[in-house]
């Protein structure tokens, strides 16, 4: 499994990349492979304030549905609207098709997440 090293990861298979004062969040290639062809990405509430680990949205495939979790405490500030019409963008390129952006309550929380090697150890 080849993972980008320019971002952090969660044990629940989200990737997180700092972009200015917000974090961009998506699901890992491993997660999209397990789910299969995605048919829906959504239920992300822009403006919602979440704690790390709380449900931020959902991804659904023909065979399963899975929650997407907030990687850090913060406020959801954007949803990738392109995914409403074309959720398969995640299947095509999991590391460029972001799902939501979160403004962290504490930017240092990024350092608490897994690096690529740590995620690889968890994900197998």
Curated annotation (Swiss-Prot):
Signal sequence annotation: none
Disulfide bonds: none
Domain Lipoyl-binding: 22-103
CC terms in the record's Gene Ontology section: cytosol; glycine cleavage complex
GO biological process, one term: glycine decarboxylation via glycine cleavage system
Family, per entry: Belongs to the GcvH family.
Subunit structure: The glycine cleavage system is composed of four proteins: P, T, L and H.
Protein name (Swiss-Prot/TrEMBL): Glycine cleavage system H protein
Organism annotation: Bordetella pertussis (strain Tohama I / ATCC BAA-589 / NCTC 13251)
């Amino acid at each position: 499994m080849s993972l980008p090293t320019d971002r952090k990861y969660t044990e629940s298979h989200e990737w997180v990349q700092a972009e200015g004062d917000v974090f961009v969040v998506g699901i890992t290639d491993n997660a999209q492979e397990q789910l299969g062809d995605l048919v829906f990405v959504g239920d992300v509430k822009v403006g919602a304030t979440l704690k790390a680990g709380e449900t931020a949205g959902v991804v659904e495939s023909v065979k399963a549905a899975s929650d997407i979790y907030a990687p850090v405490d913060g406020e959801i500030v954007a949803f990738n609207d392109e995914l409403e019409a074309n959720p398969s963008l995640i299947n095509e390129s999991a590391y460029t098709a972001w799902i939501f952006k979160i403004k962290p309550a504490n930017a240092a929380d990024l350092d608490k997440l897994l690096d690529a090697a740590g995620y690889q150890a968890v994900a197998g």
